Amino acid sequence: MLDNYEIDRFGVIHQIDVTPIKYDKQYMSYYEDLSDRTIKLGYQRLGWVLGITGEIPRSVLEIGYGTGTFIEAAKITGVADCAGCDITRFPLPKGVRFVDWDEALAGMWDLVAMFDVLEHIPDLSFLARLQARHLAIAVPYCRWRELGADGDAWFETWRMRLPNEHLHHFDRESLVALLADNGFECVTLNGFEDGIRLRPGEAGPNILSGFFRKPHPKIRRLRNKA
């Protein structure tokens, strides 16, 4: 493993010493310049969610909404309660309310979406407080463990490592294990976003998408008894 990184009991790789970056207008300008792609991603992600659940959620919270393309797609589709939470109060589409971090964790949500977000949040313990029926996530796909002896060399040059910005790195097993420890069951994992996001000549997998659900408390109690 590279210097300044460690692996936890779930297999998640964490940067140890961090110099925080600023998530400001200049940072957001990169994504605004990719507006055509981000709009497509917003609708692609919503279609993925609706295809799994077979229903329109009653409430959606997007943590780290950025340019707001996903939460706007949810609002247009007919989600009654749409909310966004971000480190900076970026503009939100009409009809979408802003909630701060405490409000986000205090609320109860049909769906919480975190696309390209989990890897940025310093303290992942908030997952234990998240009250969501469903959870949709996209993170960079870390192949360090998969590549074995070649993992360090790959990790050192991986364009998505982004020290001080991407603080945690996940593969399929570690993402599932982390969320299971916080009460979320994996429904499906895939790499569908690579169809839009891979650069010319680049080979995947590059983005790992996961959909999770939190079982009803009665179901959890029955499973624990079994």
Briefly describe each language-model feature range.
Residues 133-144:
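Conserved beta-strand signature within the Rossmann-like core of class I S-adenosyl-L-methionine
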Residues 120-121, 144:
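Short glycine-rich, flexible loops that bind phosphorylated cofactors or substrates
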Residues 115-118, 138:
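Residues lining the SAM
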Residues 120, 166-169:
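Histidine-centered active-site/metal-ligand motif
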Residues 1-115, 124-130, 146, 151-162, ...:
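Conserved N-terminal segment of class I S-adenosyl-L-methionine
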Residues 184:
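Conserved acetyl-CoA-binding loop of GNAT-fold acetyltransferases
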